């Protein structure tokens, strides 16, 4: 969904949520720390974002005002990729050793 002024719209919505008594703000689609910082400074609500390859530094996100980082499906994907690699090794080596 395209929004004409995404940052301004997000800040306006954050204020509405805050005024309505929300306990937190979950913002998706942000891709840089500067934008996150602007959003965090615009509200007293704890800010939650989804970590991505571009937003992978917990320290940077925290310094930008993020209070909670969601991993979405990324943790599961990483786990399944690791399992797949181990199973390929088991099949190739015909040994259970890669499990240990």
Annotate each predicted stretch with a short phrase.
Residues 94-100:
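Flexible, glycine/charged-enriched surface loops at secondary-structure junctions
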Residues 1-73, 77-85, 89, 93:
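Alpha/beta enzyme core
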């Amino acid at each position: 969904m395209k929004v004409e002024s995404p940052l301004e719209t997000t800040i306006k919505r954050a204020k509405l949520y805050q005024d309505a008594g929300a306990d937190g703000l979950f913002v998706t689609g942000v891709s840089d720390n500067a934008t996150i910082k602007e959003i965090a400074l615009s509200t007293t609500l704890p800010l939650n974002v989804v970590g991505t390859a571009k937003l992978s530094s917990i320290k940077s996100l925290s310094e930008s005002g993020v209070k909670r980082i969601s991993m979405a499906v990324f943790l599961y994907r990483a786990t399944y990729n690791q399992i797949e690699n181990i199973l390929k090794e088991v099949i190739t080596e015909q040994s259970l050793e890669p499990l240990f």
